[in-house]
Amino acid sequence: MEEDEGADDGEQEEEEVLLVNVGSTYPCKRSDGSQHDADIVKTRYNKQAGREEYYVHYVGLNRRQNEWVDKSRLVLTKPPKEVETNGTDQEEMTEPTEQPDSKTPQKRKLEEPEPEPKKAKVEDKDASKTAASLGAAGDFAEELTCPLCVELFKDPVMVACGHNFCRSCIDKVWEGQSSFACPECKESITDRKYTINRVLANLAKKAACTPVTPVEKKTRPLEKCSEHDERLKLYCKDDGTLGCVICRDSLKHASHNFLPILDAIGVYREELSAIVAPLEASLKVTEQLSGEQSDKIEQHNKNVSQYKEHVTSEFEKLHKFLKEREEKLLEQLKEQGDNLLTEMENNLVKMQENQDAIKKTISLAKERMEETDSISFLTDIKTFIDKCQEQQRAVISTGNTLLSKELCQGTFKGPIQYIMWKELKSVITPSLTPMLLDPNSAHPNLHLSDGLTSVRYGENKLSLPDNPKRFSQCILVLGSQGFDSGRHYWEVEVGDKTAWDVGMASESSNRKGKIKLNPKNGYWAIWLRNGNRYKALESPSKALSLTSHPRKIGVYVDYEGGQISFYNADNMTIIYTFSATFTEKLYPYLSPFLHDSGKNVDALRFVHNQ
């Protein structure tokens, strides 16, 4: 039983050796494979991994390299066992190696001073306790030091992750930020909130009242100047480096500008804030534009699908019409061909019947002619000859006429495409609308033809009654027919004119005084000036680049679709398209413009189907 108990005590002792103590320092394996001394700052239990983890600070390294590690990365060693020394052992260590002989009396040994092993052991333990207390005091002092200002805590507060800072220090760090994080562990913090740590405040006050000791003056290697071994308190604005007071006064930093670390943090945080603010505004604009661009892309894809469906539908109508006409024409060809073939085949049958009858008569006549018996030859010879003559007359009366029937070339071998095009024009939607001009809207300098199909500019004003529809200053005239639904297409002949306007106007658009022609004012139009300068009258106007000079302009209106398109009607190439939502009736409008020193005297003329 005693041996078992001894084994249990040994196991317990081994477990105690392998325990990890907060505030102690152990060698720790870093993620890069190197090994470095690390202070154990705090512990936590990872429920997901099912293990204890330790938050370590690598001695002499930047606090940003602090991390959570598990026990396997700590190098834990079992301390050597203390061996108690008795008086005999002490004697062996202090006495000369000379062995007493057997004759040496026991009295001499007793007269020698007794060693004091227990006292020495107590002194060793006191020294150990002193060192331990110094280490603990150093760790305690470090725990009472703000990691930002590296001074004892003043009005300490604890943030959500559990780290503590001076209230003024954390306020300076978080000032002007839109998102927050712990300066120690970089953990994100949702709200700018912290809790007053009264316990830590009391401890810091007590530490401040304690006489200064070497432990209290201890600074971590990270916060010391590598050159002068002094605390880093200043920031050099010229070199962008941290320094101590000696650095500031050295020749290396002569005439350099220094700031206290916290002031430098505030200055550069303000600079970053000045950079971040416009960037955040730009980000907001970019995000908005990105969303709008996504909407545009989505709408574009919808338009592609809709346009594809429209094109397919329009061509299906054409295909259907042409297919029906093709089938009808082929049916006519078959019917006419079959009828002619039947006539010729019937004629051939008659010819073959006559041929057989003639062959039979010839055969009988030759057979009678070869008869050698005179009596047999002459018997009923007249009757036989009459039958032969009757057969001859029958053949002659029937007649062997060769029939040569021809298909109608004009129908089946004529200009089929042109014929189909002429028929197609009657079913095309929209077809060419025959437009007329409204004389009640014409400017007094415009002269309309008797048929109201053309207009030209006249130097002399006509005496016309004024009315709300008439243009008083702009040289324009409306069409007499307006559109408030459906799809429509019309054309105007512009010929070799050097200036003109062609477009659409809303019913309520202004007709009096000087008018700005654009969609906002109810006008959708294109114009030509100086013989080669084309524009779409948008707001602002847009210059148009045409590859050829159109002699006819086509205008297409899809009222429900909100579309007004202009074409070069000579080859149906698109010139420009307006998109809008129409709420009232639209009327065509024309302007032949001024004479331009005799270069622009021709009239504008609506095109009608011939």
UniProtKB/Swiss-Prot annotation:
Q: Does the keyword Oxidoreductase apply?
A: no
Indicate where this protein is primarily found: nucleus
Name the segments for region: Disordered: 79-127
Q: Where is the composition biased (Basic and acidic residues)?
A: 108-127
Q: Enumerate the Pfam families for this protein.
A: PRY, SPRY, Tudor-knot, zf-B_box, zf-C3HC4_4
Its domain of life reads: Eukaryota
ZnF segments: RING-type: 146-186
Q: What SUPFAM superfamilies has UniProt attached to this entry?
A: B-box zinc-binding domain, Chromo domain-like, Concanavalin A-like lectins/glucanases, RING/U-box
- Any coiled-coil regions, as ranges: 295-374
GO MF entries: DNA binding; ubiquitin protein ligase activity; zinc ion binding
Q: Which cell locations does it reside in?
A: Nucleus
For the B30.2/SPRY domain, which residue ranges apply?
Answer: 415-610
Q: Which UniProt keywords apply?
A: Coiled coil, Developmental protein, DNA-binding, Metal-binding, Nucleus, Phosphoprotein, Transcription, Transcription regulation, Zinc, Zinc-finger
* Chain residues that bind Zn(2+): C225, H228, C247, H253
- Residue ranges constituting the Tudor-knot domain according to the UniProt record: 21-75
Q: Zinc finger, B box-type: residue spans?
A: 220-261
Sorted alphabetically, the Gene Ontology cellular component annotations on this record are: cytoplasm; nucleus
GO biological-process terms attached to the record = innate immune response
InterPro entries assigned: B30.2/SPRY, B30.2/SPRY_sf, Bbox_C, Butyrophylin_SPRY, Chromo-like_dom_sf, Chromo/chromo_shadow_dom, ConA-like_dom_sf, PRY
Where in the body, by tissue, does this protein show up?
A: Abundant in oocytes. At the neurula stage, low expression in dorsal embryo region including neural folds and somites.
Sites of Phosphothreonine modification: T104
Q: What does this protein do?
A: Transcription factor that determines dorsal-ventral body axis.
Assembly and partners? Monomer.
Q: What is this protein called?
A: Nuclear factor 7, ovary
Q: Which organism is this entry from?
A: Xenopus laevis
